[in-house]
C-alpha cells in the first residue's frame, strides 16, 4: 500500500505547527540527537567546538529545517509519485556529506527518533497519534533510504 492522502495530510498539518517555532524545534531536535547519541556531536561541524548546543547558531537551525522540510517533501512525493525524488545534485551532495561525516545506518535511526519526538512535543499529546507517527516515520525512512543509496554509490565510486 502506498503513502495515502491522509498520511500526507497528517505530515503537512503537523509541519505547519512545527514551523511556528523553528528556533525552539531546531534546538530541541539537536538536544534529542545528543541525548540519544552523545558521540554524534563530533559529526556536526557546528557542534564540535562547543561545550553545549549553541542557542543562536544559524547552521544548527538551517540543518534542522532541512531535515524537517525534506521529510515533509518526501511525504508529498510518496503520495504523488510513489517514491522519494530528490534532485540528483542534492542527493549526490547529501551522500557525499554523510559519508565524509562518518554517518552509518544506526545514525539514521537516532535522527528518526529525535525527529519523531520533536514533532510529538511540538504538536502536543492531543494531536499526536500512531497514524501521525507512522506517516512521519515512513516519509523519513524513504528519504533515509535514498540518502543511503547515494552514500553507497559514493563508496562504490571512491573504492
From Swiss-Prot:
The keyword Mitochondrion does not apply. A motif (Homodimerization) lies at residues 35-39, 105-117. Residues 2-152 form the Globin domain. Binds 1 heme group per subunit. Heme b binds at residues 45, 59, 63, 98. PROSITE patterns: GLOBIN, PLANT_GLOBIN. Keywords: Cytoplasm, Heme, Iron, Metal-binding, Nucleus, Oxidoreductase. One of its GO terms (molecular function) is heme binding. It catalyses: Fe(III)-heme b-[protein] + nitric oxide + H2O = Fe(II)-heme b-[protein] + nitrite + 2 H(+). Its cofactor is heme b. One of its GO terms (cellular component) is nucleus. Its EC number is 1.7.2.-. Gene3D superfamilies: Globins (1.10.490.10). Pfam families: Globin (PF00042). Coiled coil: none annotated. Homodimer. Phytoglobin that reduces nitrite to nitric oxide (NO) under anoxic conditions (e.g. during flooding or in waterlogged soil). May not function as an oxygen storage or transport protein. Has an unusually high affinity for O(2) through an hexacoordinate heme iron because of a very low dissociation constant. Belongs to the plant globin family. This is Anaerobic nitrite reductase HB2. The lineage of its organism: Eukaryota, Viridiplantae, Streptophyta, Embryophyta, Tracheophyta.
Amino acid at each position: 500500500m502506498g503513502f495515502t492522502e491522509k498520511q500526507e495530510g497528517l505530515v503537512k498539518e503537523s509541519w505547519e505547527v512545527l514551523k511556528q517555532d523553528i528556533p525552539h524545534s531546531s534546538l530541541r531536535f539537536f538536544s534529542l540527537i545528543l541525548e540519544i547519541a552523545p558521540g554524534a556531536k563530533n559529526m556536526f561541524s557546528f557542534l564540535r567546538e562547543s561545550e553545549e548546543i549553541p542557542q543562536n547558531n544559524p547552521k544548527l537551525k538551517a540543518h534542522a529545517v532541512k531535515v524537517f522540510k525534506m521529510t515533509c517533501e518526501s511525504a508529498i512525493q510518496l503520495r504523488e509519485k510513489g517514491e522519494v525524488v530528490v534532485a540528483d545534485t542534492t542527493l549526490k551532495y547529501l551522500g557525499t556529506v554523510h559519508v565524509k561525516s562518518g554517518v552509518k545506518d544506526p545514525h539514521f535511526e537516532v535522527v528518526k527518533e529525535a525527529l519523531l519526538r520533536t514533532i510529538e512535543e511540538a504538536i502536543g499529546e492531543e494531536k499526536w497519534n500512531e497514524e501521525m507517527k507512522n506517516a512521519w516515520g515512513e516519509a523519513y525512512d524513504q528519504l533515509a533510504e535514498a540518502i543511503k543509496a547515494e552514500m553507497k554509490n559514493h563508496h562504490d565510486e571512491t573504492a
